[in-house]
């Protein structure tokens, strides 16, 4: 599917943030590991979370899926599947599932998309080797063998992906000797690790960590207990609607964004405020009023998913917008630093790619044109927002990739006044 976005000078109305992808993934995993019935109210159904749901089913849980409620029936015991677990393009699914399948003590096969297999896996391989678990990679297939791991002390890099840390933490409490996880480099996206720890706590499993989050300890013998989750809105997805309001100087209300969310990308509200937008909270509703924007320096080490949409904001801000701490964006669904640079430049942006970030000179008068999503959901959504202030229509190729994280994205854009044409 391709989508043409018609420029829109003013938005209005309200929408609801899609449910949190990060929380949905983690609640599914914790439900699998619990003995009993775990309920997810308002879960996110998208390509990635559906991949995790399929993995949970493959490992022995029974899922009942309704429109706004998922129910997980599990014994808390993992069974080795007869067929490969398909992780699709979901990095979270793959990185959470590998440590879990090692607990079965059986040879278990997984498979993933070609693009996912280009993303780093080595830190997890090296960590599991210390637990006498081997990962063999053959093309798009992954074989895990050598378990079950007994636990103990394990070292891992913290600056490649927080998902490796979260995956090991989920599995750690089920190891005979518990788990001590030592990070050899500082953790990035710390709030996602904190979110994992909070979901585990809600299921009765406690993780101890030091202040700088370089050492984690899980005592053995802890049991996951079933619970009920109400999944709140996703800041990383809502960022696109909020940015659309900011660049069009519009007033928009976004529901279901609690101010105390543990997700790293909630910092986006602070960034918007620093750039000049007016932000107000009323309970769990964010009210944004777009105003003249100014460029700022933003380090996104703990919130890398914001990189593409921050580059778009930079195109509409006065002065320089410098985005740093973004080296990990090269290993996402696409090389996001290269992708957003090439596509924004194609429609007139003054943007420079750097080794670990981007420099945008604004305001950049964007023009009509055709751009490529690189089959990357966050690139597609960022380009759709960029098109709102362009001098003419912008066509986005392969825009269906938004279903990876935000299936209703274009519908939600239309709900606040944007005209889109699918073709």
Question: Where are the regions a protein language model picked out?
Answer:
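Short, structured segments at the rim of ligand-binding sites
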Residues: 1-423
């Amino acid at each position: 599917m391709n989508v043409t976005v018609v420029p829109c000078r003013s938005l209005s109305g309200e929408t609801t943030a899609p449910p949190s992808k990060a929380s949905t993934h983690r609640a599914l995993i914790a439900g699998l590991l619990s003995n009993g019935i775990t309920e997810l109210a308002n879960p996110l159904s998208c390509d990635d979370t559906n991949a995790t749901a399929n993995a949970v089913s493959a490992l022995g849980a029974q899922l009942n899926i309704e429109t706004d409620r998922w129910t997980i029936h599990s014994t808390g015991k993992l069974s080795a599947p007869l067929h490969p677990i398909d992780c699709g393009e979901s990095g979270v699914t793959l990185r959470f599932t590998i440590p879990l399948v090692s607990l079965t003590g059986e040879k278990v096969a997984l498979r993933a998309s070609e693009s996912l297999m280009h993303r780093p896996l080595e830190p997890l391989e090296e960590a599991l080797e210390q637990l006498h678990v081997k990962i063999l990679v053959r093309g798009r297939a992954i074989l895990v063998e050598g378990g079950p791991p007994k636990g103990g002390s394990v070292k891992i890099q913290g600056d490649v992906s927080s998902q490796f840390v979260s995956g090991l933490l989920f599995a750690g409490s089920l190891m005979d000797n518990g788990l001590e996880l030592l990070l050899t480099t500082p953790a990035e996206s710390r709030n996602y690790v904190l979110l994992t720890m909070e979901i585990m706590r809600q299921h009765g499993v406690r993780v101890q960590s030091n202040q700088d989050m370089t050492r984690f300890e899980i005592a053995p013998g802890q049991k996951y207990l079933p619970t009920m989750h109400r999944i709140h809105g996703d800041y990383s997805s809502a960022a696109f609607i909020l940015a659309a309001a900011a660049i069009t100087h519009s007033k928009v209300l976004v529901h279901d964004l609690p101010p105390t969310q543990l997700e790293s990308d909630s910092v986006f509200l602070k960034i918007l405020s620093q750039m000049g937008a007016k932000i107000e909270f009323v309970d769990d509703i964010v009210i944004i009023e777009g105003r003249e924007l100014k460029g700022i320096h933003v380090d996104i080490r703990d919130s890398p998913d914001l990189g593409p949409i921050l580059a778009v904001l930079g195109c509409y801000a006065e002065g320089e917008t410098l985005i740093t701490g973004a080296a990990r964006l090269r290993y996402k669904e696409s090389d996001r630093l290269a992708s957003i640079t090439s596509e924004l430049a194609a429609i007139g942006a003054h943007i420079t790619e750097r080794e670990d970030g981007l420099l945008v000179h604004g305001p950049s008068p964007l023009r009509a044109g055709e751009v490529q999503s690189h089959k990357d959901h966050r690139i597609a959504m960022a380009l759709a927002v960029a098109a709102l202030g362009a001098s003419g229509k912008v066509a986005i190729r392969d825009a269906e990739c938004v279903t990876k994280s935000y299936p209703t994205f274009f519908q939600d854009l239309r709900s606040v006044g944007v005209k889109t044409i699918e073709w």
